[in-house]
Amino acid sequence: MRVVAGKYKGRKLQFESTEILRPTADIVKEALFTKLQFLFPIEIFVDLFAGTGSIGIEALSRGAKKVFFVEKNHAHVKIIENNLKSLGIDYDKNNHTSNKPAIILTEDFLTALDKFDTKIDIIFIDPPYKSDFYDKSLQILENKNLMQNSGVVVLEVEENKKFNNYNFKIESEKRYGKKHLIYLTNSIV
């Protein structure tokens, strides 16, 4: 696993592929950021259920000013910390108001999102596939009006996953094997 483009292009990232940690493949990551490149540079990117942190690190590499890595699994948090350190990226933990470019939030995703008081430009949501966390994430994003008017929500889902998109508009869906990336926009503009 590596950083695909930008400031840290080609740098390798630490990871372990386990039943609960499924790092996004480089080819999917490249397609994701190619699709989103017109939005960069951006202010706020959120990597929800961050795992290894590779998606958030890619966002930093491509010019995101601040990335929030939301991950409550302590082993995964250690991987994110190691990856940020290996790239020389300054980070803070559990400080929503930090000025550092990377902020690791080691709390439940609902708690983390509930504490946000700033608008999000892009959020990448990749929870455990068998969970109802897609619906819960989208619901809190809508209820708290956390997305910028031009904001994009990206869901990484397995084939045939059903979810409630609330008032978010499905812009496009792209398939990569058994994984799908679904792009949603804020339709409450």
Regions found by a protein language model. Give the residues of each.
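Class I S-adenosyl-L-methionine-dependent methyltransferase catalytic core
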Residues: 1-189
